[in-house]
Design a protein with these regions (language model features):
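Conserved N-terminal/central alpha/beta ligand/cofactor-binding core
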Residues: 4-5, 14-15, 46-47, 52-150, ...
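N-terminal Rossmann-fold NAD(P) dinucleotide-binding loop
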Residues: 34
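Flavin (FAD/FMN)-binding glycine-rich loop and adjacent Rossmann-like elements that form
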Residues: 3-8, 16, 60, 148-149, ...
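Aromatic pocket-lining residues of Rossmann-like dinucleotide-binding sites
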Residues: 41
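Beta1/beta-strand and adjacent pyrophosphate-binding region of the FAD-binding site
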Residues: 19-31
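Conserved beta-strand-loop-beta-strand element in the redox core of flavoprotein oxidoreductases
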Residues: 156-177
Length: 554
């Protein structure tokens, strides 16, 4: 890792035995960025290998079970054409297969869950089905090979190039080494940056490095945003679905963070934007017509009413009797885990963090079922049923933890608070890049961190994604394809969201494809006027929006 020191390249000897293969572009990590990168490579006629640690592609949207955090203009502009197609195909899946009410079916902007966090809250399995269908023609044509349940364990470098990556098959322990002229790191934590010795940053930079007002005085690589094991719930009155008491329940029931207004397992929590103590409400299966729900983060964060905040199936959008409960996704302040950093303390540290995060979410569920205060004066909601059938697990938790912050490349261009924070650039300001390869918009949203920081949630402006943020300073053929691009601990807070991750992956895949077709390297594309113009035209043809109209930050 690198905050004060630089990581140097190291060659890793190839392991004996195992499977060996070659492709045009190796994409390690099958989240939204990896999927978008694979589509971009295959659309251009090149071959790709896409790997994924879990057995589900889609990352945030599927295996991590996080409904998309999106900006208020998402239905009009501000995302790539392929991301818009993904959203519309999810809607069409519901229209084709679900017993929607006629008035819901006819909505052009159908929100299947009627959640308040997003204009498109949907079940992880539906998003997975759409992603698999979208990739299917490329797999059938032999352009795309997908290796699920594979994790990178070694990178093989020569000079300033990554020549191959060795992956471990998590099902049987075998090794598979893939050689490729271009390697994309789409992992959730930027794993390849560490394995390949690519110069990178982890955690919080010192304020002096970029003069960011919200950076700490001292750099701290172990100061990272908390992770979350999301879980899916439905509620069935009169039934008892209480789980076994989690092993660490006593600890979490009594846990009081120093910056919290009371116990973490409670309905009183800070407002992320003001840090004032604000009560949350919890009412399973409310009678409010879901057609009356508005999802607009610029007007209302939507997080005060917990059941509807991230609801992914609204029973009242469907014909009477089709579903006896909504399904909601629990990704709340109450189950953010920040006791131990996920990255930077080796495999043992990773295991501790994942175990702690799982125990916290299970403890929250048990508390909800047994001790949570009800509006009628009673305690507990034993009818809460964990929906492992929705998340693809036995316990109802997501397959993987939601990771907000990764290792980040030391990039040719680093996006800092001075490029995006509204109080620094004004409501219509922000840096405009001649090499922009996409756009995004979201508040700078930092969750409580392993360094003891409370929320940092501040206004930002609609921003651009510079090509330079996808280029490592030294390594020539590895590209970031997710939240590991050239941002800071602070600006990661607005560049980590679903549509931005997709855009970064799509741009990285398109860049690798362009370099293969033109016989150039990524840094040449940015440095040479003709190459840059040709590449940007390629993005324009593919429907990648690179600049914003005149819209105000929030």
């Amino acid at each position: 890792m690198d905050t004060a020191e630089t990581v140097t390249s190291r060659a890793v000897p190839a392991p004996p035995g195992g499977v060996e293969s070659a492709t045009d572009v190796l994409i390690v990590g099958g989240g939204l960025g990896g999927v978008a990168a694979a589509l971009a490579v295959c659309r251009a006629g090149h071959r790709a290998v896409l790997t994924e640690e879990t057995d589900w592609l889609g990352g945030q949207l599927t295996s991590q079970a996080v409904p998309p955090d999106e900006h208020p203009w998402v239905e009009q502009f501000g995302v790539t054409a392929s991301y818009r197609q993904l959203r519309e195909r999810i809607r069409e899946y519901y229209r084709q297969w679900y017993p929607l009410r006629a008035e819901a079916r006819e909505l052009p902007h159908l929100n299947p869950g009627a959640g308040r966090v997003s204009k498109l809250c949907a079940e992880p399995r539906v998003a997975l089905a759409v992603i698999e269908a979208t990739l299917a023609p490329h797999r059938a044509a032999g352009r795309l090979t997908v290796l699920t349940e594979h994790r990178p364990v070694a990178a093989h470098t020569e000079g300033d190039e990554v020549r191959a990556v060795t992956l471990r098959d998590l099902r049987g322990g075998g090794r598979h080494t893939v050689t490729a002229p271009y390697v994309l790191d789409a992992t959730e934590t930027g794993e390849l940056l560490e394995l390949a010795g690519v110069e990178h940053v982890l955690g919080a930079e010192a304020r002096a490095e970029h003069d960011e007002p919200h950076a700490p005085e001292q750099a701290d690589p172990l100061n990272q945003q908390g992770i979350t094991f999301c879980l899916a719930l439905s509620h069935h009155a009169g039934e008892d679905h209480t789980i076994d008491r989690p092993a660490d329940y006593a600890f979490w029931r009594d846990y009081r963070p120093p910056f919290w207004p009371g116990p973490l397992l409670g309905f009183q929590a800070p407002d992320p934007r003001t840090l004032e103590s604000v009560p949350r409400t919890f009412e399973p299966n409310p009678e409010l017509d879901p057609l009356d729900v508005s999802a607009d983060q610029s007007a209302d964060a939507g997080d005060k009413e917990l059941w509807g905040f991230r609801r992914i199936l609204a029973r009242r959008l469907h014909r009477d009797g089709a579903f006896d409960s909504d399904i909601t996704l629990v990704n709340w302040p109450l189950n953010d885990y920040w006791e131990t950093p996920l990255v930077g303390l080796g495999e043992a540290g990773e295991r501790r963090a994942l175990h702690g995060a799982r125990q916290l979410s299970l403890s929250l569920l048990y508390w909800l079922q047994t001790e949570a205060p009800r509006a009628d004066g009673g305690t507990g909601f034993p009818g809460l049923r964990p929906r492992g059938d929705v998340t693809g697990t036995a316990d109802g938790l997501a397959k993987a933890a939601y990771v907000r912050e990764a290792r980040r490349i030391r990039a040719v261009t680093t996006v800092t608070e001075h490029d995006v924070a509204m109080d620094l650039v004004g409501p219509y300001g922000g840096t405009r890049y001649p090499d922009s390869v996409g756009v995004g918009a979201y508040r700078i949203d930092l969750h409580p961190s392993t360094g003891g920081d409370n929320y940092v949630d501040i206004a930002s402006v609609p921003f651009e994604i510079p090509l330079g943020a996808l280029l490592p300073r030294r390594v020539t053929n590895l590209l970031p394809a997710g939240k590991n691009l050239g941002t800071t601990h602070v600006t990661n807070g607005c560049y980590r969201l679903h549509p931005v991750e997709w855009n970064v992956g799509e741009a990285a895949g398109a860049l690798a494809a362009h370099c293969l077709s033109e016989g150039v390297v990524p840094h040449q594309v940015r440095a040479e006027e003709k190459q840059l113009a040709d590449f940007l035209r390629r993005l324009d043809r593919e429907g990648v929006q690179r600049h914003w109209p005149d819209v105000r930050g929030y």
